[in-house]
């Protein structure tokens, strides 16, 4: 749409011919690029994907929304196990961003782990690598690619693993200066930390989380274990 006060894109209603939830815009042009690069970059809108291909980034597709669906995950996973979510800067760090990440992660969980399985993607043999590319405020992928290709490439190449992104952005979600805020952050992030198989990777995330919360690492470890017991009946990722 051309009105800045309204939504960027208006899709038609679901029909037998068009179903937004099962469509990846540009996938017909991106298959070879995804195969060659070993990863897919997922953007929100049509223009983001169109501009990316015009400028030579042929592994970019649009998920036509802020979160991936199970149908889209199944399609993407056939081509690659590394997915980068390139978030629009106007929602990056906002509540909408975290809901989008949560829904995308849950879509991967349901496809690869199963609805009734309590394990995590980190423990599957699929080794899904879901990363987040966060851009400067006020810019979306379309604008960044047109004005600063180096910035686009740097952000994509230095995209953060999902858990690292969540830990880094914890202060945006909770008041971690308070003990209550620290507890809420821990309850949400604990299941992901504990689901990591590699001892060294898990220790690294403990260290990152301790730094973010400004507490000793042994305190974080104890709090994470306690929080995970409390949340044992909840989903792997639960944003409150």
Regions found by a protein language model. Give the residues of each.
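Phosphate-handling DNA/RNA-contact segment within nucleic-acid enzymes
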Residues: 1-83, 95-100
